[in-house]
């Protein structure tokens, strides 16, 4: 099922929407130079983690998945596999799980939580609330 159209607010409709990498970047990764820049950084992070088999799900939220022409950055939630061990990562990949370094080096905001965590549902509920306290959609990207 394709990603839904934007609401009048510029957000996706409430819910967790699914997209593969191709559909995700086709929808959100072009239109302005800033979108292309953010998409390039996001694509790079996906390419770094995909072959490692450590990610169960990738959830994207925030201005990158809105109609906003110039999103400042992308916001990612890495939902890691239960066997995930950050200490086994290369330095290049480890920075993608450090909020300060990921922001500085890739211009992305990151959170991570293990798959099966009792707090995952609560976290997703929180991420789906805008600064104006309205509900918005999130996108789960299938790597």
In which residue ranges do the predicted regions lie?
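Aromatic/basic-lined ligand-recognition segments
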Residues: 77
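Catalytic core of pol beta-like nucleotidyltransferases
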Residues: 1-59, 65-72, 80-143
């Amino acid at each position: 099922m394709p990603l839904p159209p934007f609401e009048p607010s510029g957000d996706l409709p409430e819910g967790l929407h699914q997209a593969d990498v191709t559909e995700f970047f086709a929808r959100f990764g072009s239109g302005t130079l800033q979108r292309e820049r953010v998409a390039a950084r996001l694509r790079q992070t996906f390419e770094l983690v995909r072959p490692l088999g450590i990610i169960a799900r990738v959830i994207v939220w925030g201005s990158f998945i809105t109609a906003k022409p110039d999103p400042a950055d992308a916001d990612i939630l890495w939902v890691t596999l239960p066997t995930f061990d950050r200490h086994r990562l290369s330095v290049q990949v480890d920075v993608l799980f450090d909020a300060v370094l990921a922001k500085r080096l890739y211009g992305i905001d990151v959170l991570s939580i293990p798959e099966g965590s009792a707090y995952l549902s609560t976290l997703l509920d929180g991420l789906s609330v805008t600064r104006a306290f309205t509900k918005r959609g999130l996108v789960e990207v299938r790597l």
